[in-house]
């Protein structure tokens, strides 16, 4: 039995008749509903489909409602709009159909928040621009450093900018109501920057008497800097490598991933590693060797779960990718290096005696091949 959980994102590919059931039986432990896509009622229907399946099969799996968060995007563009290095582009918060001269930005406070010299990244970092001026009202002028196609509704990242948008947008609050009405197990909070973002969501959950856990998605540099406080307040964290890899230098992502996993283990908080884990299996029946290694390393480092995104939501082989990931996880867990994830207790720890007993119990269980450890308590 694998201990590392598999999170599968639901979408058109996995919601085909019979596929959802196969995913469950092949090893999915958490079904993720991405509220960035679909209407609230469509997502409610998906949640109900999962619940019906779990009732029928008498199997256990969690449901994660992943909120979109303050994702920045450009508006509609004219077809085949291409910008070249050296071009100047005007970003406006006044709605328009964009061209190579002017682009609509959905973020209304953009002219007030950005500063001269800051970076604008578009389409997952494929296009790079630098701010050269702002009228502090409705327009920002940027110079193209790395050009390419400007396509409609593509995402925007501002790695140097302190964005004034709230962590929970009006859309998120509407989606959250649906998720809580259907009693999901987890709520994913996107683009977390500081612990106060988690406290804001916690206040809403408490007000609605919800027992849902908060999954803080680490995808902003500010969140990496405040990781200790975030781990204290959140119920679990996700290393969301997609936007994180755009917001910070790519070469930093593996080190940040290892650091977050290590800190999560120390604080006994579940940690998920996500994004492009088995990306090639969107179109291929087998993963690349690098992807196999990526999943395995996450397991060996101590990740509690590994996540599939487009692989199961829109990929050609959703069942096969879960089956393959499950095999990789099981094989990786057979290594002795994955048995005991916690660090050795130090005499200066506040709970040194309890920690030392638990640590040695785990080592002994591993040595003798025990199937389980029984802990007796007074209070439960």
Language model features: what each stretch is:
Residues 1-380:
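Non-catalytic helical/linker scaffolds that mediate oligomerization, partner binding
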